[in-house]
């Protein structure tokens, strides 16, 4: 998920979707924004790992609130092996950085947000996923307060689905 921007009803819808899909881990690609909205993530049935976005101001408070619910805030970038897949997570403010991650050959999956436009593509044998914004999706080039999106990864099949909230 990405770009929740303190919109609590959208965060709740995303959490409901993740719990109903029985996900093992939630990765948030940044722009939670304010620490108060982190409390909603306590309702997740799994752990959440986040990176910071360009609108995440009080990162110390975000980190503290996330740690209180068993989550983590990793800064601008997170890379790890999850389910046997090498995953890179970044907000995606700099498209050149996302492209470098894809071309590096180090990752099976690169996840970014920032653009609010959901997509899934294969590039250089890498699964590239932008879950869009759970709060303010882009529709026909315009930021809206419509139905947001999240993505669900299937690490075994190396595939992803975009789900509307």
State each model region's role:
Residues 5-9, 33-36, 55-61, 94-99, ...:
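Active-site environment of divalent metal-dependent phosphoester hydrolases
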Residues 79-83, 99-100, 105-106, 122, ...:
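Binuclear metal-dependent phosphoesterase catalytic core
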Residues 45-95:
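Helix-adjacent hinge/juxtasegments
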Residues 38-50, 124-128, 132:
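Short acidic, glycine/proline-enriched helix-loop-strand junctions
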Residues 67-72, 109, 140-143:
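Short linear motifs in intrinsically disordered
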Residues 1-2, 25-31, 48-54, 88-91, ...:
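Active-site neighborhood of phospho(di)ester-bond hydrolases with catalytic His/Asp-centered motifs
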Residues 1-43, 47, 57-59, 68-71, ...:
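N-terminal active-site segment of His-dependent metallophosphoesterases
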């Amino acid at each position: 998920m990405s770009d929740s921007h303190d919109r609590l009803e959208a965060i709740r819808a995303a959490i409901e979707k993740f719990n109903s899909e029985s996900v093992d881990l939630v990765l948030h690609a940044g722009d939670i924004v304010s620490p108060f909205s982190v409390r909603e993530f306590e309702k997740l049935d799994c752990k959440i790992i986040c990176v910071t976005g360009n609108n995440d101001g009080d990162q110390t408070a975000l980190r503290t609130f996330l740690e209180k619910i068993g989550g983590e805030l990793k800064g601008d970038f997170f890379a790890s092996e999850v389910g046997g897949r090498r995953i890179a997570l970044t907000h995606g403010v700099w498209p050149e950085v996302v492209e470098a991650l894809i071309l590096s050959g180090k990752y099976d999956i690169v996840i970014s947000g920032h653009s609010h436009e959901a997509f899934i593509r294969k590039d250089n044998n890498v699964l590239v996923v932008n879950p869009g914004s759970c709060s303010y999706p882009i529709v026909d080039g315009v930021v809206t307060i419509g139905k947001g999106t999240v993505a669900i990864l299937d690490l075994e099949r190396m595939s992803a689905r975009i789900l509307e909230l």
